[in-house]
């Protein structure tokens, strides 16, 4: 084997070999249980980020683990067309490169442009997924706009429409005036903002007066510009100030519209003035109030968010109406909405109707992609009746057909599902699945799979002109069908029968509503088993936390703290990293701050660590928490782990290749160390499998690390040296056999998490075991064997390790050279301790570098010594002639002074209020941790001073 482990040389050729050999495909053995994971489809034109790498590492670990258990495994791969995101990228691109908008191109040509862009950049993410070692079946790769998936989308839409579960209605939606489309509640980002509350007088009509004799009501509003669309004023029916006015009218300022005063709980007596203006077409709460009191709806805004030239007037049901005039005063027409706000306030003030303006804290909705203030807008949209679909989806989780891991996410799911609103599925975009609905000139709507079907079903001749609905479906509509559309539905395919319901869905908790809930609803409605019972899309939902940076901040381009997973695999120079983080920024003014931060964090760029080290780190971080802080130190630690495994394997091979390892018969004697490592390894298998079976990848990674590094490399390889240097033929055969057996099993155990290094080493080790199979990927996963757990060997070895560590600690504390042989005395020995010493003198003398071992008689106290206690004995190392007492005390005093300096430096830092207020929580925690470490070190040194002073 090469002297050093070089991931760059092995990873890509190995992956290409695996893919070419077809190892990622299902084994097709239908007598075996199937295991299937559907990858959450990433955006087709995107690139891999840490969240993808994290979730895909977990999925690949599960798939490889189940594949090695002989299951018929499918990891279904694919990408998402990501409507709004992809359209925005291409719109930006043509604006930057050609100075054009999509309207300059027209719909067909612009969509062609997007397909071109997909062809150009659509391969990036799949290339990157290969680099991660993902063992997905590439031959089954799907895209949400593939013909097959598009047919499934049409099929679902048509069936839901025929069942009256999809309808078209004029409703209030979140409108993004920049992107000119409806967006869902989940895509709205609410930001805290400092604003104003305007108090405006609305004159009472017909000589009415308030309880205290005023001829006007004072209405408090944060949105004076929408006054032009008011159709009522609400007061609380219990409010003594106004309840006698319910049913009377006010005259709306500026427009002179006569509008009613209604009694409604929405008006809060304690808030503002207790009178609320009602604009059903421009506010979600007002829309509901308007419905309850049959108020008309007046839309005063264009889709760009400007004031219209004439208003649209509708009755409560959304039909056009002439109950009110559609006139808008000329001075406000065509004004942008925030300019209109100023103009309305000025006009009201000029009439003497502006009573006061108060500062007011409010929450303002922004579109998370367009970045502008969202406008509630009255539009015709398509909706899914969600309550009908939600009922079975709630029951599936209640009765355990679907389980959430961690379980607490079930409550999050229930709270949303039990109060679910109808789902607005239409989007005013061009890129996506076009809604399969057609209109004739009279405005009648026809829904069908295509225009021919519509004409046939409705007997429409060629003379009837039809135009297709311009809108496309919400991206999440097609994603909701992902588990079954990818397997060939609506055809009843073999794949659907074999792999549905799927086994596990891995997802971030941030898309539990967007995606998880909707998959459950859609799947249970459309997929039934042979008895007609609704099928769930998956049995388990494993929710991951979100990967944040080392300070707990969300990774984002604007913060400049994004780490590309492949930069940790391949390494990246500082100039390249700076270019990546500060080039093409949406907010160039942040570049300087980002540059400084990056230079501080990565002064030499990022070193290459290889894919396995990245995967191991991600698995080790997969705790059950919501937030997972990335840690470069751990990545370095797991790269060191890979090096350690490589070097240990070289040691094993150097001692076994070309030797008799006992795989072809011959007498074998197992040493205590051999019996111990086999017992440890089997206990490791058991605990590791339990961790993987319960989705505790962090615990599994910890178990693997602890066994490999501490037990196998640090102890067992050392413990084999006495046999290797002077054992009998049978002992040598036994130890070689154990070395190879444990290493080969360990490689299979570790393979799901670190596939590349394990396959590479295994190819060398398999020859020694007489294995002829081609790949570790299809080898059986290690099984726990209770007969290999030798309790006596475990107990005896544990004791020997304690004794060896005790002697090593005395050396370190007393500053004695590691190579100097020592004399060891044992005092107050139990029978067990004496037996252990006598049976294992060779081990003890070699590993603790001892020149002699003497068990003292019961009454002998022994000479002046440094002592350590182990189970059933006291270990003594006589100090005569080993150290110079004065020099040693002086050295320790110097050490103590140095540590005290560090302690006071950190204490001053933590006492500085400015530092504590400014520094991130993670930084403060790190300082406290350092302080604890120094305090412990100081206590140890003082203890040593006392021991030496007493000599």
From Swiss-Prot:
InterPro entries: aa-tRNA-synth_I_CS, aa-tRNA-synth_Ia, Anticodon_Ia_Val, M/V/L/I-tRNA-synth_anticd-bd, Rossmann-like_a/b/a_fold, tRNA-bd_arm, tRNAsynth_Ia_anticodon-bd, Val-tRNA_synth_C_sf. It catalyses: tRNA(Val) + L-valine + ATP = L-valyl-tRNA(Val) + AMP + diphosphate. The gene is valS. GO terms for molecular function: aminoacyl-tRNA deacylase activity; ATP binding; valine-tRNA ligase activity. Keywords: Aminoacyl-tRNA synthetase, ATP-binding, Coiled coil, Cytoplasm, Ligase, Nucleotide-binding, Protein biosynthesis. GO terms for biological process: valyl-tRNA aminoacylation. GO terms for cellular component: cytosol. Monomer. ValRS has two distinct active sites: one for aminoacylation and one for editing. The misactivated threonine is translocated from the active site to the editing site. A motif ('KMSKS' region) lies at residues 554-558. The keyword Transit peptide does not apply. A motif ('HIGH' region) lies at residues 42-52. The keyword Phosphoprotein does not apply. ATP binds at residue 557. Catalyzes the attachment of valine to tRNA(Val). As ValRS can inadvertently accommodate and process structurally similar amino acids such as threonine, to avoid such errors, it has a 'posttransfer' editing activity that hydrolyzes mischarged Thr-tRNA(Val) in a tRNA-dependent manner. This is Valine--tRNA ligase. Its EC number is 6.1.1.9. NCBIfam families: PRK05729.1, valS. Residues 880-944 form a coiled coil. It comes from the Bacteria. It is an enzyme of class 6 (ligase). It is found in: Cytoplasm. Disulfide bonds: none annotated.
